[in-house]
Amino acid sequence: MNLNATILGQAIAFVLFVIFCMKYVWPPIMAAIEKRQQEIADGLSSAERAKKDLDLAQANATDQLKKAKAEAQVIIEQASKRKAQILDEAKAEAEQERNKIVAQAQAEIDAERKRAREELRKQVAMLAIAGAEKIIERSVDEAANSDIVDKLVAEL
């Protein structure tokens, strides 16, 4: 019986140990395990949210980059058009200035040519009068001389 009393005592001690463990040891261990499980679940959900946020940020960055490239292309095209417009305006202005200078030079040439012709006509008339004076050996008075020169200039 001794053996049976020992087994019974050990069984009672084991049951008391199990009750003690279930009442005082098991709840803190389970609380720590549940807390750790909750932290892991929170960490996983946080990581999942961070991944979604990262994907969204990358998509936004890609969209903004595309928009910036499109805007840059539009600005480049506008600058090219403006450059061509400025060049065309400068060419037109230079052409007008050239035409103006050429016309002014042509007018000056024509005026100089006309003045030279008039001067030449007067000199020819004077030479003709001088020749005529020598031929007739007399001098014509200044009024008559002036009339003759004017008539010769008009005829030439």
From Swiss-Prot:
The chain crosses the membrane at residues 11-31. InterPro entries: ATP_synth_B-like_membr_sf, ATP_synth_b/b'su_bac/chlpt, ATP_synth_F0_bsu_bac, ATP_synthase_B_chain. It is a single-pass membrane protein. GO terms for molecular function: proton-transporting ATP synthase activity, rotational mechanism; proton-transporting ATPase activity, rotational mechanism. The keyword Membrane applies. It is found in: Cell inner membrane. Keywords: ATP synthesis, Cell inner membrane, Cell membrane, CF(0), Hydrogen ion transport, Ion transport, Membrane, Transmembrane, Transmembrane helix, Transport. SUPFAM superfamilies: F1F0 ATP synthase subunit B, membrane domain. Its main location: membrane. GO terms for cellular component: plasma membrane; proton-transporting ATP synthase complex. Belongs to the ATPase B chain family. F-type ATPases have 2 components, F(1) - the catalytic core - and F(0) - the membrane proton channel. F(1) has five subunits: alpha(3), beta(3), gamma(1), delta(1), epsilon(1). F(0) has three main subunits: a(1), b(2) and c(10-14). The alpha and beta chains form an alternating ring which encloses part of the gamma chain. F(1) is attached to F(0) by a central stalk formed by the gamma and epsilon chains, while a peripheral stalk is formed by the delta and b chains. F(1)F(0) ATP synthase produces ATP from ADP in the presence of a proton or sodium gradient. F-type ATPases consist of two structural domains, F(1) containing the extramembraneous catalytic core and F(0) containing the membrane proton channel, linked together by a central stalk and a peripheral stalk. During catalysis, ATP synthesis in the catalytic domain of F(1) is coupled via a rotary mechanism of the central stalk subunits to proton translocation. NCBIfam families: ATP_synt_b, PRK05759.1-2, PRK05759.1-4. This is ATP synthase subunit b.
